[in-house]
């Protein structure tokens, strides 16, 4: 990370896409995409996905590391080009507990991530706990972030400290996505970014963490990009001009969250304006979902009814029987909720792919289609971009390859934004 930030600060229009997903096909897509490019790949886990108690994936930080390393080994991707990050590390998961208890768990969370070899650590203590006022005083946020940083510094070995980097601040919706519709988004004011930096610097110095301040590479801000279930707020560079100018005077860059579904030109403009770390998550699993749905349509055309996976029906059955991950986010009317379940840009389906019934039906779908030849006309009908790539001879038409390539469509837009010489 340090090398990428140094090159950006030296004037190169270079950035990095942060892949925020625990889905094995998404991780495989990212690693295959940059297998021969020489670029580093940044893969991040959030505190609610992966923590010392297992998170909703059932993985502790060391488990997630081994999971990613296992995929890298299968793909042949060298570990030294992999950067592992932890996002929203702080009391996020324990906001309903008193601050003292939540911070105790947060310290252990940080230690577990650093001990497992994660080198990019987002120190996020911005959320109010059960006995806190709302919003939290910025100095309290900074003091808590400093305590988390202290935990990281005492855990890291000297070798780890060579690569260890921190991200501070938060200016993002609830981790996991917006719960309600958005119409506009507030761009961070440069004075608020400056205050975030000043309060964190002061709090770090009180704890003797002057050396750690040199490892702070980025501040999370809101440059004016967001999405909800049905709409996207696109980047307007002129609205973020003052914010973009302020960061030039520091040794840092910005990190932008929720950059999913922006145009490739927007990614290039964001990187030009010093939002050099671009996080993406739901757009990747949305592309995965599109690929699964497209393959299900092909299966309906090619496989006899009694042999089909019924993957779309299984998804509906599971999500309606177990609505915990989508109910409070989607519209209450039945017909509207079904559209959201299937097609929402916030992609709450992503929480259901590990479900045993859904996983088995996806496996059957892929097995069924592996046993037949996929007609080019059918691929053109349901995956037209992949059809073009088949015609160019850069893709072979297996179900697995089609899924991977569909996810990589998203990564192509980020590569255009993060790499100045990509046309």
Swiss-Prot record:
Belongs to the GatZ/KbaZ family. GatZ subfamily. NCBIfam families: agaZ_gatZ, PRK15052.1. It comes from Salmonella newport (strain SL254). The gene is gatZ. Keywords: Galactitol metabolism. Component of the tagatose-1,6-bisphosphate aldolase GatYZ that is required for full activity and stability of the Y subunit. Could have a chaperone-like function for the proper and stable folding of GatY. When expressed alone, GatZ does not show any aldolase activity. Is involved in the catabolism of galactitol. This is D-tagatose-1,6-bisphosphate aldolase subunit GatZ. Disulfide bonds: none annotated. Forms a complex with GatY. Pfam families: GatZ_KbaZ-like (PF08013). One of its GO terms (biological process) is galactitol metabolic process. The lineage of its organism: Bacteria, Pseudomonadati, Pseudomonadota, Gammaproteobacteria, Enterobacterales. Pathway: Carbohydrate metabolism; D-tagatose 6-phosphate degradation; D-glyceraldehyde 3-phosphate and glycerone phosphate from D-tagatose 6-phosphate: step 2/2. One of its GO terms (cellular component) is plasma membrane.
């Amino acid at each position: 990370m340090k090398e990428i930030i140094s090159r950006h600060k030296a004037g190169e229009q270079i950035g990095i896409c942060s892949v925020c997903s625990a889905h094995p096909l998404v991780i495989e897509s990212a690693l295959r995409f940059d297998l021969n490019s020489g670029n580093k790949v940044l893969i991040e886990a959030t505190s609610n996905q992966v923590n010392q108690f297992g998170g909703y994936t059932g993985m502790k930080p060391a488990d997630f590391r081994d999971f990613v390393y296992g995929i890298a080994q299968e793909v042949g991707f060298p570990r030294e080009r992999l950067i592992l990050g932890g996002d929203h590390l702080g009391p996020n998961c324990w906001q309903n507990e008193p601050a003292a208890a939540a911070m105790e768990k947060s310290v252990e969370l940080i230690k577990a991530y650093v001990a497992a070899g994660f080198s990019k650590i987002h120190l996020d203590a911005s959320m109010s706990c059960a006995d806190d006022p709302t919003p939290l005083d910025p100095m309290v946020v900074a003091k808590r972030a400093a305590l988390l940083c202290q935990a990281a510094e005492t855990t890291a070995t000297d070798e780890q400290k060579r690569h260890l980097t921190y991200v501070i601040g938060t200016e993002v919706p609830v981790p996991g996505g917006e719960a309600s519709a958005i119409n506009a988004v507030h761009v961070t004011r440069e004075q608020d970014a400056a205050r975030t930096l000043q309060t964190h610097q002061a709090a770090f110095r009180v704890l003797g963490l002057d050396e750690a301040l040199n490892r702070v590479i980025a501040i999370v801000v809101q440059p004016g990009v967001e999405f909800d279930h049905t709409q996207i707020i696109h980047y307007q560079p002129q609205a973020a001009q003052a914010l973009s100018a302020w960061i030039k005077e520091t040794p840092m860059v910005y990190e932008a969250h929720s950059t999913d579904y922006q145009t490739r030109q927007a990614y290039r403009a964001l990187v030009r304006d010093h939002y050099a770390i671009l996080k993406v998550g739901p757009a990747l699993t949305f592309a995965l979902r599109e690929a699964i749905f497209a393959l299900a349509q092909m299966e309906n055309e090619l496989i006899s009814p009694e042999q089909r996976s019924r993957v779309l029906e299984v998804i509906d059955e599971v999500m309606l029987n177990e609505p915990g991950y989508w109910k409070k986010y989607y519209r209450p009317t039945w017909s509207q909720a079904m559209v959201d379940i299937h097609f929402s840009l916030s992609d709450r389906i992503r929480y259901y792919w590990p479900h045993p019934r859904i996983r088995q039906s996806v496996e059957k779908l892929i097995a069924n289609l592996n046993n037949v030849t996929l007609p080019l006309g059918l691929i053109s009908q349901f995956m037209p971009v992949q059809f073009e790539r088949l015609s160019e001879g850069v893709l072979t038409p297996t179900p697995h390859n089609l899924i991977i390539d569909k996810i990589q469509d998203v990564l192509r837009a980020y590569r255009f934004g993060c790499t100045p010489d990509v046309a």
